[in-house]
C-alpha cells in the first residue's frame, strides 16, 4: 500500500511547511501562553523539546498509509500520464467511471470539462492532467493536515499533562533553569495526580522545617572552592591605620597600685594628715602600693606594609554525586521518617540544579535502591516516599553497599551521606578500616545526618562531618519558638 511519505514526494507536497505551521500553532495556544507566563523557567525546557516533536511528526507522516481509494486514483493518474492523446481518448470513459466509483473530488469537474468540449485535443489532455494533479495535491494536503491535527491534539494533551505535573513540582524541585529542564524531561513518564501529590506533601513539610532545608543546602555546598596562596604574586604597598596606646592620658580607666602622687585617691591622701598613719603612708609610697587612678589614652598612626596584589588562587573542588543511605528501622518512624524523606527531597533538588546524581539506599533488614536524578526520577522519588520505615538497623550492610558503589568509576567522586539516629550496634573492624582507607587514599567524604542526640559516639566518630538535626520534642519546640 502506498505510504503518505511516498505520495508527498510524488506530488511535491511540502510536509515540512505543514509541520512547522502545526508546531507554531501549538506553541501559540492559550494553554501554553498562560503556563509560560506562570513558570518562565519551564519555557526554555519545553522549547528545547520542539525538535523531538518535529521528529515524531515526521515519523508519523512517513509511516502513515494512504486510503485505498486515493491509492487507486493516484495509480490511475500515473498510468494516464504515460498515455498519448489518442490513447487517452480511448481510455477516458474508463477513467471517468473509475473517478466516479472512487467518489473522487475531481470526478464531477472532470466530466464537466469533457462535456464542455466536443473534441479532445492535446491541449485539453494536458489541462485535464494538470487539474487532476491539483485535485490530488489538495487531497494529499488534506490528508496530511488531518493526521497532523490528530497528532496535535494528542501532543497537546501530553504537554498539558506534563505541564500540570511540572507546574506542581517546579516550586519544590526546580531551583534554576537546569533543574527545570531536567524536571521537564522526567515528567514524560506515566504519572497520575495522586502519585506526585506525595512529593508536594513532603515539599510543603520541608518548607515548614527551614532548619532542615538549610542543613541540606550546607551539605550540598560543602565542596566550595578553596583559596591557596600564589608564589608568583606581585607585591604592592598597602597603607593602614593602627591603634596604639598613647602616652597622654585621656580618660579614667580604673584603679591601680602605684607611687603616682598626682593621681592619689582622696582616702590615701587623708592618711598623710594622721600622725599615726604617716609612716605607713611613706612605706606604701616606697613600695608603690598606694591606690591611684589609672588613666588611659590611645592614638592612631599610619602603618605601611607590602602584600601580594593577587594573593590567592582558587582550587575548585568537584561536586560529585550523592549516595544517600537512609535508616528505615522502626526507631526512625514518625517524625524522623518525615524529616529523612524531606531531607532526601532537598538533596534531589540540589542534584537537579547542579546536574549531579542522587542515589538513595534504604537500609533495614535489606537494602532498596532508588535513582532520583535519572529519567524516571519522579517515579523513583514517589516509590521512595511511599516506603514505610520499620524493622531493624543493619548499619554495617549500609556501609558495605556504599563502599561497593564507590569503587565503580562513575561514583569515584561521590559524597556518602548516612541519615540515621545512629542507635545501633558498633561497626565491625573491617568496615571501619575500609572506610578510613577510602577517606585517606581516595578522599571520599562520609557525612552523617544525626536525627537524634543519643547516637553512639563510637559509630559517629568515623564520619568526616556530622550534621545534627535533633528531632526530639524539646528541640522541635525550640526551633518553632525561634521562628
Curated annotation (Swiss-Prot):
Indicate whether Amino-acid biosynthesis appears among the record's keywords.
no
Task: Pull one GO CC term from this UniProt entry.
Answer: cytosol
Question: Where is the protein localized?
Answer: Cytoplasm
- By its UniProt entry, which NCBIfam families does this protein fall under? PRK10997.1
| UniProt keyword terms in alphabetical order | Chaperone, Cytoplasm
InterPro entries tied to this protein: Uncharacterised_CoxE, Uncharacterised_ViaA, VWF_A, vWFA_dom_sf
The record's similarity note reads:
Belongs to the ViaA family.
Check the record and name the PANTHER family matching this protein: PROTEIN VIAA
Q: How does it assemble?
A: Homodimer. Interacts with RavA.
The UniProt gene name for this protein comes to viaA
Put simply, this protein is called: Regulatory protein ViaA
Q: What CDD domains does the entry give?
A: VWA_YIEM_type
TM segment ranges:
none
What organism is listed for this UniProt entry? Shigella boydii serotype 18 (strain CDC 3083-94 / BS512)
Q: Does the keyword Cell membrane apply?
A: no
Function statement: Component of the RavA-ViaA chaperone complex, which may act on the membrane to optimize the function of some of the respiratory chains. ViaA stimulates the ATPase activity of RavA.
Amino acid at each position: 500500500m502506498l505510504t503518505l511519505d511516498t505520495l508527498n514526494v510524488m506530488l511535491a507536497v511540502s510536509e515540512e511547511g505543514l509541520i512547522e505551521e502545526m508546531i507554531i500553532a501549538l506553541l501559540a495556544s492559550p494553554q501554553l501562553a498562560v503556563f509560560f507566563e506562570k513558570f518562565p523557567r519551564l519555557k526554555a525546557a519545553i522549547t528545547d523539546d520542539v525538535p523531538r516533536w518535529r521528529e515524531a511528526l515526521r515519523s508519523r507522516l512517513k509511516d502513515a498509509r494512504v486510503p485505498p481509494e486515493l491509492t487507486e486514483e493516484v495509480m490511475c493518474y500515473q498510468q494516464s500520464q504515460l498515455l498519448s492523446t489518442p490513447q487517452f481518448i480511448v481510455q477516458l470513459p474508463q477513467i471517468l467511471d473509475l473517478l466516479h466509483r472512487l467518489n473522487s473530488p475531481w470526478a464531477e469537474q472532470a466530466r464537466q470539462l469533457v462535456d464542455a468540449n466536443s473534441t479532445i485535443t492535446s491541449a485539453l489532455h494536458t489541462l485535464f492532467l494538470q487539474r487532476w494533479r491539483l485535485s490530488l495535491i489538495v487531497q494529499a494536503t488534506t490528508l496530511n493536515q488531518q493526521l497532523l491535527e490528530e497528532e496535535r491534539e494528542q501532543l497537546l494533551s501530553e504537554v498539558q499533562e506534563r505541564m500540570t505535573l511540572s507546574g506542581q513540582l517546579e516550586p519544590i524541585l526546580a531551583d534554576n533553569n537546569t533543574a527545570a529542564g531536567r524536571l521537564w524531561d522526567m515528567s514524560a513518564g506515566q504519572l497520575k495526580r495522586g502519585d506526585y501529590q506525595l512529593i508536594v506533601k513532603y515539599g510543603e513539610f520541608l518548607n515548614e522545617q527551614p532548619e532542615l532545608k538549610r542543613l541540606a543546602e550546607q551539605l550540598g555546598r560543602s565542596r566550595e572552592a578553596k583559596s591557596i596562596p600564589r608564589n608568583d604574586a606581585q607585591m604592592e604597598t598597602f597603607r593602614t591605620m593602627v591603634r596604639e596606646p598613647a602616652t597622654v592620658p585621656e580618660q579614667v580607666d580604673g584603679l591601680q597600685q602605684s607611687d603616682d602622687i598626682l593621681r592619689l585617691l582622696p582616702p590615701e591622701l587623708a592618711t598623710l594628715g594622721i600622725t599615726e598613719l604617716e609612716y605607713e603612708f611613706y612605706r606604701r609610697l616606697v613600695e608603690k602600693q598606694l591606690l591611684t587612678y589609672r588613666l588611659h589614652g590611645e592614638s592612631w598612626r599610619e602603618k605601611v606594609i607590602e602584600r601580594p596584589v593577587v594573593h590567592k588562587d582558587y582550587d575548585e573542588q568537584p561536586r560529585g554525586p550523592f549516595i544517600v543511605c537512609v535508616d528505615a528501622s522502626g526507631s526512625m518512624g514518625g517524625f524522623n521518617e518525615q524529616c529523612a524523606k524531606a531531607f532526601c527531597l532537598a538533596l534531589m533538588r540540589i542534584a537537579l540544579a547542579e546536574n549531579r546524581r542522587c542515589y538513595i539506599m534504604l537500609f533495614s533488614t535489606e537494602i532498596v535502591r532508588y535513582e532520583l536524578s535519572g529519567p524516571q526520577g519522579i517515579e523513583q522519588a514517589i516509590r521512595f516516599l511511599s516506603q514505610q520505615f520499620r524493622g531493624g538497623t543493619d548499619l554495617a550492610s549500609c556501609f558495605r553497599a556504599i563502599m561497593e558503589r564507590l569503587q565503580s568509576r562513575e561514583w569515584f567522586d561521590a559524597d556518602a551521606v548516612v541519615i540515621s539516629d545512629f542507635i545501633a550496634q558498633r561497626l565491625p573492624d573491617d568496615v571501619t578500616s575500609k572506610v578510613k582507607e577510602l577517606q585517606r587514599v581516595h578522599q571520599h567524604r562520609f557525612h552523617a545526618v544525626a536525627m537524634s542526640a543519643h547516637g553512639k559516639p563510637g559509630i559517629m566518630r568515623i564520619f568526616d562531618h556530622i550534621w545534627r538535626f535533633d528531632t526530639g520534642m524539646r528541640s522541635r519546640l525550640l526551633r518553632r519558638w525561634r521562628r
